[in-house]
Amino acid sequence: LLHGTKLREVLLNSWEGVHFDISETSMVDMTRDFAALGGEMFVVDDGWFGDKYPRNGATTSLGDWMIAPSKLPNGIRPLINLAHNNGMKFGIWIEPEMVNTTSELYEKHPDWVLRHPDFEPTYGRGKTQLLLDLTNPKVQDHVFKVVDDLMTQYPDIYYIKWDNNMSMSNTHSQYLPAELLSNLYVDFTLALEKILKRIRAKYPDVVIQLCASGGGRLNYGFMPYFQEMWTSDQTDAYHRILIQWGALNFYPSNMLAAHVGSAYSKYTQRLIPIKFRFDVASMCRLGMEMVPSKLNDAEREYAKRAIAENKNIRPVVQQGELYRRVSPYEGKKDFSSL
């Protein structure tokens, strides 16, 4: 695991709080409010990019990795500075292997995607998403450039969330010759590894989280290139007990990200007390995923105490030896002991 002995920061991710509704005002407020809770990093998730096609939903903009002036008219520099001025680090979301058909990139390079030219492709998220053909060296350069441009312009970006919300549903390369198409899966994976090695050669220290519609890429092969992985999009704490118990059979706790969501789970329509949410998320790398200003006074005070306590115990949680005592798969499903 890359940087496996380094303690992980407590962060706030914007996704479940505002989804695509990114604005300078909302990001400033979330940064300040999280700093007041003792947070250590703020991450701007999906929704910050797209010039011709601003990212207001899942149907557009992937591939156009320029800041949307309609959303962040002053760019992300003020947000980075604000985070630093509040004693925090800054992170940002990208999905560099993907493109939407409604994007400037697709308009310029429709031949860069995996699809057969004679058949309607299978689309991913938003019914316009396609997977870029990483076997094409020009696409490899593009994916590297997504990271390189961000880090060149904003070298003090500390953290990148690298997402991947579509599997290889269209198994045809417009770049490879016909006799090599049977090896597409292998060649694609080797091309991705080549890109990651290139990124790590230039940016060995930037923290990169690997996400794939949750934990779709949770595997050992990516560990040398990523410091952490998003365990699951399911943030309901009751379900997370089961998910994290299983994942901790194979992966260290400092590699698995676990976030405290809102009291009301959009996935299960269940109300969950804040203490239970923090207890479960503290089993791994603790984070939050909500609008902090929506906490009431009692919840806000509890969150401050829980974050402070996590900083005290995380050397044990993230670097200690794990002993399994009570499995949530035996008897009660909302209880485990580690």
Protein language model regions, located:
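Aromatic-lined carbohydrate-binding/catalytic grooves of carbohydrate-active enzymes
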Residues: H3-K145, Y154, Y158-Y159
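Generic recognition of flexible, low-complexity loop/linker segments
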Residues: M30-R32, L79, D148-D149, L196-R198, ...
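Active-site neighborhood of glycoside hydrolase catalytic domains
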Residues: A68-G75, N85, E107-K275, D279, ...
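Short, solvent-exposed polar/charged micro-motifs at secondary-structure junctions
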Residues: D21, T102-S103, N219-Y220, G331-F335
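Carbohydrate-binding/catalytic loop surfaces
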Residues: A58-G63, P117, Q174-N183, S327-S337
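Glycan-recognition and catalytic regions of carbohydrate-active enzymes
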Residues: E289-L338
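Structural signal for hydrophobic packing residues in well-ordered secondary-structure cores
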Residues: L1, G38, N310-R314
